[in-house]
């Protein structure tokens, strides 16, 4: 549909974890997934997926968003609620990763001198993205991690396992900021 040209993808079958591996002592499917995709064996990079169309024509598209920065933000958050034109809503939940490392778009733009910290808001990042098409691949190569999603009936949950609250909850890396 015009205006919605940027897909989010479900987890490709070749990346699906072997859930038979899961035992009660492991959380699933994330830990099982980590057994499938190892850093030495990464899947397509973000640039290959977003710019080169590595997943096109595979019927993996779950939904189409209006701007590539919106897809990046959803991946950064790890899950979210999609609002469709017909008024329905659907949870897009974390399903897996491509095995590459990722980084904050704001952090990258600040460190590379592209944006001052004062302008590194989502609005500022979107403005930068729209006005620098020739620099997009450099960012996507620097942050090549990719998040795949699944539809779910449950409300999105954060790292601590609690339901997320709109405008209150935020994404954190427990290696940097302890939970709780």
Regions flagged by a language model, labelled:
Residues 153-179:
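C-terminal soluble interaction/assembly domains
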């Amino acid at each position: 549909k015009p205006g919605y040209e940027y897909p989010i993808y479900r987890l490709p079958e070749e990346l699906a974890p072997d859930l038979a591996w899961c035992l009660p002592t492991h959380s699933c499917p994330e830990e099982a997934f980590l057994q499938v995709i190892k850093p030495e064996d990464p899947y397509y990079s973000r640039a290959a997926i977003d710019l080169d169309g590595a997943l096109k024509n595979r019927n993996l598209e779950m939904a189409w968003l209006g701007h590539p920065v919106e897809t990046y933000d959803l991946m950064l958050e790890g899950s979210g609620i999609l609002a469709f034109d017909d008024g329905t809503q659907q949870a897009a939940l974390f399903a897996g990763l491509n095995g590459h490392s990722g980084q904050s778009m704001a952090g990258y733009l600040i460190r590379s001198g592209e944006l001052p910290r004062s302008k590194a808001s989502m609005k500022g990042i979107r403005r930068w993205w729209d006005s620098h098409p020739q620099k997009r691949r450099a960012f996507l190569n620097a942050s090549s991690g990719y998040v795949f999603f699944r539809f779910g009936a449950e409300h999105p949950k954060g790292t601590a396992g609690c339901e997320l609250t709109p405008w209150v909850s935020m994404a954190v890396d427990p290696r940097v900021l302890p939970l709780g």
